[in-house]
UniProtKB/Swiss-Prot annotation:
Heterodimer of LeuC and LeuD. [4Fe-4S] cluster binds at C299, C359, C362. Catalyzes the isomerization between 2-isopropylmalate and 3-isopropylmalate, via the formation of 2-isopropylmaleate. Pathway: Amino-acid biosynthesis; L-leucine biosynthesis; L-leucine from 3-methyl-2-oxobutanoate: step 2/4. This is 3-isopropylmalate dehydratase large subunit 2. Belongs to the aconitase/IPM isomerase family. LeuC type 2 subfamily. Binds 1 [4Fe-4S] cluster per subunit. It catalyses: (2R,3S)-3-isopropylmalate = (2S)-2-isopropylmalate. It comes from Rubrobacter xylanophilus (strain DSM 9941 / JCM 11954 / NBRC 16129 / PRD-1). HAMAP family: LeuC_type2. InterPro entries: Acnase/IPM_dHydase_lsu_aba_1/3, Acoase/IPM_deHydtase_lsu_aba, Aconitase_4Fe-4S_dom, HAcnase/IPMdehydase_lsu_prok, Homoacnase/IPMdehydase_lsu, IPM_dehydratase_rel_enz, IPMI_cat. The keyword Transmembrane helix does not apply. Its EC number is 4.2.1.33. Its cofactor is [4Fe-4S] cluster.
Length: 424
């Protein structure tokens, strides 16, 4: 029976020889991940199961990132618990100054390779699909079961094929591609399905752009998003990952729930206006929208590519006096690379604040939350009411070029009005 890529990965990690969308199967985990919010809850559930030790310490990673650095005594206690539990279990732990945002550090440190199945205590575990892996976000009770037994139940999802044709133009980034997809199928259009990204446009994307695309598959309601592994993947993993992997692809005659085409040649920078990732317009249609804060970072767009794009706009310019600009490298490695390239100097000279790697304000935790009546434009992945602070604030989503241009202008503008042509 022909299968899609996602179906192949799930079946290969189960005890069944074949399965179809809608079937419920038990799936083995290659890696289980949790953070300072989801981890301690999962530990309590695991203890209630009467299980004292994880199924395999080499396949478990814990990351303190949501409230890093700790914003108060309660968040400090969560991080203390995460570290002490990790030490007791002998699992790898990323703490302050030693990692960054979970979905960035696990990729850049070679934990993720094509063909894996990853269960994560975070909804954006779908990010790992950028490397041809099946990453799915689970609740803390299911994560507890994964920690204890190394498996979880999964209803086999159907697959929506998303074909990117052509090539992206100036000031267009991975964020725009996934916003275009969400605008097309809707925020619930991917329910009970996987988004599989294919086509010449997909193949031409850098790994950082693929991470941005896969990261927001869940914003379309999808189980995950996935790119077939290729030479771009192989080059990225060279000297990062030491485990063997073999590329897998969907069968030519595999069955899809739906097929969608996005023409990159005609795609321009986009903005998701409040209060939904599906409320998407061209940046030209949002021109003139006043901005109080710009936030560039997060697990979807805090890579070195995003920081380079930000620097192209900010270099030689100043942040508007009525705007707060916050820039958050997604990992210590990204931060150090930005320092070595002189990007941090560009940001500081422009009047921006540079933060340690953290989830921070993205989920309304700390370090840049919004007050009532304020509006932000951000490279993060969600803009629901109350997502970044006050429920009476507004959040717009965009790529780093667009966000940085708004920081300079004090309002949403086309990046070309600030910088004539991107260098990279």
């Amino acid at each position: 029976m022909p299968h899609t890529l996602a179906e192949k990965l799930l079946i290969s990690h189960s005890e069944v020889d074949d399965a179809s969308p809608g079937d419920i199967i038990m799936v083995r985990c290659d890696l289980v991940m949790a953070n300072d919010v989801s981890g301690p809850v999962a530990f309590r559930q695991m203890e209630r199961m009467g299980v004292q030790r994880v199924f395999d310490p080499s396949k478990v990673v814990m990351v303190s990132d949501h409230f890093m650095p700790a914003k108060d005594a309660r968040s400090a206690a969560l991080q203390k618990r995460l570290k002490s539990w990790s030490d007791l279990q002998g699992v790898y732990y990323y703490g302050q100054g030693r990692g960054g945002i979970e979905h960035t550090v696990l990729v850049e440190d070679g934990w993720i390779v094509p063909g894996m199945v990853i269960a994560g205590g975070d909804s954006h575990t779908c990010t790992y699909g950028a490397l041809g892996a099946f990453g799915t976000g689970l609740g803390s009770t299911d994560i507890a079961a994964c920690l204890a037994f190394g498996e979880f139940w999964q209803q086999v999802p159907g697959t929506i094929q998303v074909e990117f044709t052509g090539h992206k133009g100036s000031f267009v980034a991975g964020k725009d591609l996934i916003l275009a997809v969400i605008a097309d199928i809707g925020v619930g259009g991917g329910a009970n399905a996987v988004l599989e990204f294919v086509g010449e446009g997909a193949a031409s994307l850098s790994l950082d752009d693929r991470l941005a695309v896969a990261n927001m598959a869940v914003e379309a309601g999808a189980e995950t998003g996935i790119f077939p592994a290729d030479e771009v993947t192989a080059r990225y993993l060279d000297r990062r990952a030491d485990r063997e992997w073999h590329p897998e692809r969907s069968d030519p005659d595999a069955s899809y729930v739906r097929k969608v085409k996005i023409d990159l040649n005609s795609l321009e920078p986009l903005v998701a206006l409040p209060h939904s990732p599906g409320n998407v317009v061209a940046v030209s249609e949002a021109r003139g929208t006043k901005i109080d804060q710009v936030y560039i970072g997060n697990c979807s767009n805090g890579t070195i590519t995003d920081l380079r794009q930000t620097a192209e706009i900010l270099r030689g310019n100043r942040v508007h006096p009525d705007v707060r600009a916050i820039i958050v490298p997604a990992s210590q490695k990204v931060y150090r690379q930005a320092i070595s390239e002189g990007l941090i100097d560009v940001f500081v000279e422009a009047g921006a604040v540079v933060s340690t790697p953290t989830c921070g304000a993205c989920f309304g935790g700390h370090m840049g939350v919004l007050a009532e009546g304020e509006r932000a434009i951000t490279t993060t992945n969600r803009n629901f009411k109350g997502r970044m602070g006050s429920p009476l604030a507004e959040v717009c989503l965009a790529n780093a070029y667009v966000a940085a241009a708004a920081a300079v202008a004090g309002e949403i503008v086309e990046p070309a009005s600030i910088c004539s042509e991107p260098v990279r």
